[in-house]
């Protein structure tokens, strides 16, 4: 017979009792009442938070947006085809967040931070809330450093500073994305992390942007967030916030960042679709009442941080598409009032061959001039004046037949200045090169050239400055000032290159 040892049994029982864990896990579970059009109505989630992530039986994730008396309105982040009426939903206790980190550089991700470029998983170090609070007044510093776009007409007349929000607005096919991509390419030597957010774009358009950035070796410091036209409205709605969260990680680590939202019109449309399906009351143009807050809370996250917080910055370039150049529509006026200035692209200028098609007359930068480099300030003031007078005279000269010599000279110079400001796509210029071209134009060095050969001469002048042992580029690049020494060197370069060009 086996010996039973009571002391051993009692010690085992005591050990089991000591290890007994009395923690009770309570899941808040609800039932799907109806589902369709990317929206689910759920009954029974009494403890749910506004904006909380919910998990359905088929692992689809949704966001609780409408908390009503008897049900919860949930927007789905997937197609929801496997969700059935009566299936269960449980709360996750989490608010929407996205993984962030250095490993995201050079990658294409969806608004949830999952890679969609086929290059494997991304090792993330931390997560950030999609809807983070914008920095307060004490956390900020006034805009004081320039962000060079490499586009002469912008850097000279509508300068952008680090931490600024500058709207790019225009009709479809007027070169809005081209300006944004050029700006990214120009940050190659500037140590700026760029985030391009494609909202509601064709996947082929985003692929084209990726190809251009790879060709120009700009993907190394760029993250692309893509919610294409065939993605659910929920993903299109959160994509800009995801881009801002990715940029914030670098901003709070003391880096300069640039975020491009291309474009916020499509985000507003996605939000309108969600709101109408959730039966929220429509307002002007059927947009919900809080569509202003949709964009203001996003764009307020762009800032130049104080030195105490590391001095990082986030510059935002939101893009808005207008219909028939109607800037007074609801979304354009909203975003114009939120941002620190706008670059207006005109269809007529684009079609008449002036590219980038920037309408300088109605484009403004409200804070960027404080951050403009001294070299550019020295030549840009006169350029603005010349172009403003030229625009006025050009309109007048269409009616007047006999013009005096001074007026004809001014018109001729204005036409040549306009040629100087034309620039091919994906070929941004350095500050020194821009200053050289503007100086050449405003001081009459191009007056004796034919209008048709101005662009050709500008190209030859730049190649001369970059290849000869002329000291101009070195002086301006190192001092950021257009000194008397630099002016002398530039005048020499102009006369030498012109002599070769005129042969």
Swiss-Prot record:
Sites marked Required for activity: 363
Q: Which Pfam families match?
A: ATP-synt_ab, ATP-synt_ab_C, ATP-synt_ab_N
Its keywords, alphabetically, are: ATP synthesis, ATP-binding, CF(1), Chloroplast, Hydrogen ion transport, Ion transport, Membrane, Nucleotide-binding, Plastid, Thylakoid, Translocase, Transport
The protein's topology relative to the membrane is: Peripheral membrane protein
Has keyword Cytoplasm? no
Under Enzyme Commission nomenclature, its number is 7.1.2.2
Could you say which residues bind ATP here? 170-177
Q: What Gene3D superfamilies does the entry give?
A: 2.40.30.20, ATP synthase alpha/beta chain, C-terminal domain, P-loop containing nucleotide triphosphate hydrolases
- Membrane: is it a keyword of this entry? yes
Please indicate which superkingdom the organism of origin belongs to: Eukaryota
Q: Name one GO cellular component term.
A: proton-transporting ATP synthase complex
Molecular function terms in GO for this entry?
ADP binding; ATP binding; proton-transporting ATP synthase activity, rotational mechanism
Catalysed conversion reaction = ATP + H2O + 4 H(+)(in) = ADP + phosphate + 5 H(+)(out)
Q: Where in the cell is it found?
A: Plastid, Chloroplast thylakoid membrane
InterPro entries in alphabetical order: ATP_synth_asu-like_sf, ATP_synth_asu_C, ATP_synth_asu_C_sf, ATP_synth_F1_a_nt-bd_dom, ATP_synth_F1_asu, ATPase_a/bsu_AS, ATPase_F1/V1/A1_a/bsu_N, ATPase_F1/V1/A1_a/bsu_N_sf
Classification via PANTHER family: ATP SYNTHASE SUBUNIT ALPHA, MITOCHONDRIAL
What's the family? Belongs to the ATPase alpha/beta chains family.
Q: Quaternary state and partners of this protein? A: F-type ATPases have 2 components, CF(1) - the catalytic core - and CF(0) - the membrane proton channel. CF(1) has five subunits: alpha(3), beta(3), gamma(1), delta(1), epsilon(1). CF(0) has four main subunits: a, b, b' and c.
**Function (record text):** Produces ATP from ADP in the presence of a proton gradient across the membrane. The alpha chain is a regulatory subunit.
Protein name in the entry: ATP synthase subunit alpha, chloroplastic
Gene symbol of the encoding locus: atpA
């Amino acid at each position: 017979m086996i010996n039973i040892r009571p002391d051993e049994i009692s010690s085992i029982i005591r050990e089991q009792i000591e290890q007994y864990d009395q923690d009770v896990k309570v899941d808040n579970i609800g039932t799907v009442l109806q589902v369709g059009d990317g929206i689910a109505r759920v009954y029974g989630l009494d403890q749910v938070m506004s904006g909380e992530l919910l998990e359905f039986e088929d692992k689809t994730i949704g966001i609780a947006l409408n908390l009503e008396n008897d049900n919860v309105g949930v927007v789905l982040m997937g197609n929801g085809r496997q969700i059935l009426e009566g299936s269960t939903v449980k709360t996750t206790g989490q608010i929407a967040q996205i993984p962030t980190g250095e490993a995201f550089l050079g990658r294409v991700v969806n608004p949830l931070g999952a890679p969609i470029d086929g290059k494997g998983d991304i090792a993330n170090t931390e997560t950030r809330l999609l809807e983070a609070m914008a920095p307060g007044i004490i956390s900020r510093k006034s805009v004081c450093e320039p962000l060079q776009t490499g586009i002469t007409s912008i850097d000279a007349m509508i300068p952008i500073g680090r931490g600024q929000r500058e709207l790019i607005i225009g009709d479809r096919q007027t070169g809005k994305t081209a300006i944004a991509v050029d700006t990214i390419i120009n940050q190659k030597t500037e140590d700026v992390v760029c985030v391009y957010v494609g909202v509601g774009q064709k996947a082929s358009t985003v692929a084209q942007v990726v190809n251009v950035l790879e060709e120009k070796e700009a993907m190394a410091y760029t993250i692309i967030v893509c919610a294409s036209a065939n993605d659910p409205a929920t993903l299109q709605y959160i994509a800009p916030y995801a881009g801002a969260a990715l940029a914030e990680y670098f901003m709070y680590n003391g880096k300069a960042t640039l975020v491009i939202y291309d474009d916020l019109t499509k985000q507003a449309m996605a939000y309108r679709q969600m709101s109408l399906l959730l039966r929220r009351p429509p307002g002007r143009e059927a947009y919900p009442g809080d569509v202003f807050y949709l964009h203001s809370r996003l764009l307020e996250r762009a800032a130049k941080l104080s030195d105490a917080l590391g001095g990082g910055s986030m510059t935002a370039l939101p893009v808005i598409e207008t219909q028939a150049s109607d800037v007074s529509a609801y979304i354009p006026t909203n975003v114009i009032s939120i941002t620190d200035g706008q670059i207006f692209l005109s269809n007529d200028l684009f079609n008449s061959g002036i590219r980038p098609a920037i309408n300088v007359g109605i484009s403004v930068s409200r804070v960027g001039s404080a951050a403009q480099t001294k070299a550019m300030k020295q030549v840009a003031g006169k350029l603005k004046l010349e172009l403003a007078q030229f625009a006025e005279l050009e309109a007048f000269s269409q009616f007047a037949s006999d013009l005096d010599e001074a007026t004809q000279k001014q018109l001729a110079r204005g036409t040549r200045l306009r040629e100087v400001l034309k620039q091919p796509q994906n070929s941004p210029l350095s500050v020194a090169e821009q200053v050289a071209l503007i100086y050449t134009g405003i001081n009459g060095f191009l007056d004796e050239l034919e209008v048709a050969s101005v662009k050709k001469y500008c190209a030859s002048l730049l190649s001369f400055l970059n290849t000869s042992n002329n000291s101009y580029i070195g002086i301006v690049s190192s001092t950021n000032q257009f000194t008397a020494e630099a002016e002398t060197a530039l005048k020499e370069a102009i006369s030498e290159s012109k002599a070769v060009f005129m042969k």
